[in-house]
Amino acid sequence: MSSGTEHRRNQVLRAIVSDFIASHEPVGSKMLVDRHQLGVSSATIRNDMAVLEAEGYITQQHASSGRIPTVKGYRRFVDGINEVKPLSTPERRAILDFLEHGVDLEDVLRRSVQLLSQLTRQVAVVQMPDLRRGRVKHCELVKLGSHRILLVLITDTGRVDQRNVDLGQPISDDDLPRLRDLVNSAMVGRTLDDACTNIAALANEAKGNSMPEELRDVALVVTTVLVETLLERPNDRLILAGTPNLMRTSELSPVVEALEEQVVVLKLLNSVRDLQVQVSIGEENEDEELRGASVVSTGYGNANAVLGGMGVVGPTHLDYSGTISSVTAVAHYVSRILSEE
């Protein structure tokens, strides 16, 4: 088979997939001749369609109907996308402005899925940060009374933990900054596991004679609370938007159930390891509940690491080029905001 024939058949396949995505109706040879500049007769296109069907790229639901893409056909279409639809400059500005108004990480992520759902008209999902990948950014100690302080632990993933701590004895205004400096020098810039190890070592110092006497008792209380806080691993959580968009398609009801249970989608997003977009189509999805859907996903993060995954879940006939563009743009701006914080 000549390269020209192969190129033409690829054009025919791309035309079938594009038309089916746009209309959700089977595509016939006459429709292709009328809509696309393929430069060949309807008979040649019919022959190409027969070959594509024999190779498993398209299928025919009824003898008298046109063709629709198979998962194999969608995969070849997606792999052949060289350029995704670019978002306009006003669209990009609007995305950044909307996300920058988020008051904290969770608000930024909620806004991101709202945007993705609106841009793609599908379900958008985002995974809250994997806390194991975070590093301690700062620990603040705020005096609430002679015996009580507010302990605030902040990580670069946006996690903020607050604890009211009863010290069991008074702490002076001079000793509080000294204690704050001790715990920050042990934790800042370190992973949660390393910070926990260092704080445990600091607790041992408080039990011995290597720490100033006036700080030992209060340091032991504070380090104990910090170790408990650092060891906590809240369950992964998904934020969703646009679930009603899937309700329009009855065959996607198992997907809706999977989204509600979260476990299946979390497993998929947990597999995201970088900021490259991944597309899994229909039967390519490992979990049965997602085999009627396509998932376009990517990672988001700061300058140090990927913190979690986000993406779009929709039918196999979703607009792949537009969806890839939207997911890429929103993840980019979320990552940019996190890196600036």
Swiss-Prot record:
SUPFAM superfamilies: GAF domain-like, Winged helix' DNA-binding domain. It comes from the Bacteria. Gene3D superfamilies: 3.30.450.40, Heat-inducible transcription repressor hrca homolog, domain 3, Winged helix-like DNA-binding domain superfamily/Winged helix DNA-binding domain. Keywords: Repressor, Stress response, Transcription, Transcription regulation. One of its GO terms (molecular function) is DNA binding. It holds the Pfam family HrcA. One of its GO terms (biological process) is negative regulation of DNA-templated transcription. Negative regulator of class I heat shock genes (grpE-dnaK-dnaJ and groELS operons). Prevents heat-shock induction of these operons. Belongs to the HrcA family. NCBIfam families: hrcA. This is Heat-inducible transcription repressor HrcA. It comes from Corynebacterium jeikeium (strain K411). The gene is hrcA.
